[in-house]
Amino acid sequence: MSWIERILKKNTITKKTNIPEGIWVKCNNCNQMIYKIELEKNLEVCPKCNFHMRISARKRLEKFLDKNNILELGKNLEPKDILKFKDTKKYKDRLYIAQKLTKEKDAIIVMKGSLYKMPIVAAAFEFSFIGGSMSSVVGERFVFGVNESIKCNCPMVCFSASGGARVQEALISLMQMAKTSAALSKLRKKKIPYISVMTDPSMGGVSASIAMLGDINIAEPKALIGFAGPRVIEQTVREKLPDKFQKSEFLIQKGIIDLIIKRKNMRFSIGKLLAKITNKPEPKKE
């Protein structure tokens, strides 16, 4: 027994209670503590300040698509360390860590399903997998999605969340920009709608290719969108950048994106847009 316990009465001493990890999440915007279950129910959007946190690709697609008849495309494709690349870590070690962390094989998931009973192909980037970087597998899976969209004559939607091309795959990664853009040109020739949704962040080679090539370009609130980051630009031009530079609210004022849609409204809003474009009955709000 410590000296303080001898002085104070036992009933006035409160012993420290260990709170299990993972119950509370701190919002990066308002710094408020949020009950994790409440945050998950709110689609990873802070109920205090409406800040859109990052959400996993699989969870995003599960909440976006109708519940039944979902087929994952290109799920057997896995990245390979063709260049035997090594920086501070070997590329194959980075892949192993990322796969263990995310339970995914690479940084994009592509699914064929339906949205309010309308056939659709949807893709989503997994930012937790090496920053959602574009690899050869990401490019190939995306092209799988485009080809399936052409085959079924159904719209395609892509949710971007990426830092750009994957450094560890060098020129192979850069080539995916041209490859995916060429695939989207086939979609356009067939007059099949492609909607791009840019989430935080959509940067680098992804923003310079598939993220900006939508027939309709949508963004989530306060998403960082651009090629180089604002800090890099500021250091290069040596000038103070405008407030909220490269944020979705800034870009919509400049006409770079078409719409800003909150995550909770995304499913219905895109369903409504696609129904109008494809001349289908307008969906009823759930």
From Swiss-Prot:
This is Acetyl-coenzyme A carboxylase carboxyl transferase subunit beta. The keyword Hydrolase does not apply. One of its GO terms (biological process) is malonyl-CoA biosynthetic process. Keywords: ATP-binding, Cytoplasm, Fatty acid biosynthesis, Fatty acid metabolism, Lipid biosynthesis, Lipid metabolism, Metal-binding, Nucleotide-binding, Transferase, Zinc, Zinc-finger. One of its GO terms (cellular component) is acetate CoA-transferase complex. The gene is accD. It comes from Wigglesworthia glossinidia brevipalpis. It is an enzyme of class 2 (transferase). Its cofactor is Zn(2+). The keyword Cell membrane does not apply. Zn(2+) binds at residues 27, 30, 46, 49. It catalyses: N(6)-carboxybiotinyl-L-lysyl-[protein] + acetyl-CoA = N(6)-biotinyl-L-lysyl-[protein] + malonyl-CoA. Binds 1 zinc ion per subunit. Acetyl-CoA carboxylase is a heterohexamer composed of biotin carboxyl carrier protein (AccB), biotin carboxylase (AccC) and two subunits each of ACCase subunit alpha (AccA) and ACCase subunit beta (AccD).
